[in-house]
Swiss-Prot record:
PANTHER family: 54S RIBOSOMAL PROTEIN L1, MITOCHONDRIAL, LARGE RIBOSOMAL SUBUNIT PROTEIN UL1M. Binds directly to 23S rRNA. The L1 stalk is quite mobile in the ribosome, and is involved in E site tRNA release. It comes from Salinibacter ruber (strain DSM 13855 / M31). GO terms for molecular function: rRNA binding; structural constituent of ribosome; tRNA binding. Transmembrane segments: none annotated. This is Large ribosomal subunit protein uL1.
Length: 237
């Protein structure tokens, strides 16, 4: 099995190495899809290196966006709310709904069987104690990302439809899945373009010099495909 996987990666790598220079985003989307040769529906990921220093609060790049073609995966949603909002959350399709019992499970059992947590503002006093567990994993409800809200039905609908959160890490890198290998090249391109436009829009005013330092697209088991930065900036206008 290892030899087969190694041969697949080698073939995929040779396909990418044929490109001497970075390619336009649309071509990169097709190449990334072509390099996905594993026996499962690989994720297609967009990786950015940004010219920011996240250790400075005014250079943190974070946000959320609903990808035009969704993410291609089922998203498990936990809603932490008082009883008055729990029925609304259940009817909107939340996978787990409650409050005290889930806070207890997370604290005592380190239970994390969900992708997104939504909380209503009135319970954040209780939910806040989960910050040390959920925060480092990017699961803590946050007003800026729309996951602290009284409009739980709308929030659930957006997340299930393909809303994602993104945040630059301490080294200025941003890694975000933008679809699956089963997507068409056009769908992958549209998702990547939407995310890039949002990241460009969020450029911190204090970030000097080159902002988009590198852009690559890759399948889970495939090599990175380099994307031409100038073409991305041109298309984002």
């Amino acid at each position: 099995m290892a030899n087969i996987e190694g041969k697949r990666y080698q073939d995929a790598n040779e396909l990418v190495e044929e490109q001497d220079e970075p390619v336009k985003l649309r071509e990169a989307a097709g190449l990334a899809k072509d390099t996905a040769t594993a026996n499962f529906d690989e994720s297609i990921d967009l990786d950015l290196r940004l010219g920011v220093d996240p250790q400075h609060a005014d250079q943190m790049v974070r946000g959320s966006i609903t990808l035009p073609n969704g993410t291609g995966r089922e998203v498990t949603v936990l809603v932490l709310a008082s009883e008055g909002k729990q029925q609304e959350a259940e009817e909107a399709g939340a996978d787990y709904v409650g409050l005290d019992e889930y806070i207890e499970r997370i604290e005592e059992e380190n239970w994390l069987d969900f992708d997104v947590a939504i909380a209503t503002p009135d319970v954040m006093g209780q939910v806040g104690q989960l910050g040390r567990i959920l925060g480092p994993r990017g699961l803590m409800p946050n007003p800026k990302s729309g996951t602290v809200t009284m409009d739980v039905a709308d929030a659930i609908e957006e997340i299930k439809a393909g809303k994602i959160e993104f945040r630059v890490d301490q080294s200025g890198n941003l890694h975000t899945p933008i679809g699956k290998a089963s997507f068409s090249p056009d769908e992958l391109y549209e998702n990547a373009q939407a995310l890039l436009r949002e990241v460009i829009r969020l450029r911190p005013a204090s970030a000097g010099g080159l902002y988009l330092r590198s852009i690559t697209l890759s399948a889970t088991m495939g090599p990175p495909v380099r994307v031409d930065r100038s073409s991305v900036l041109s298309e984002a206008r």
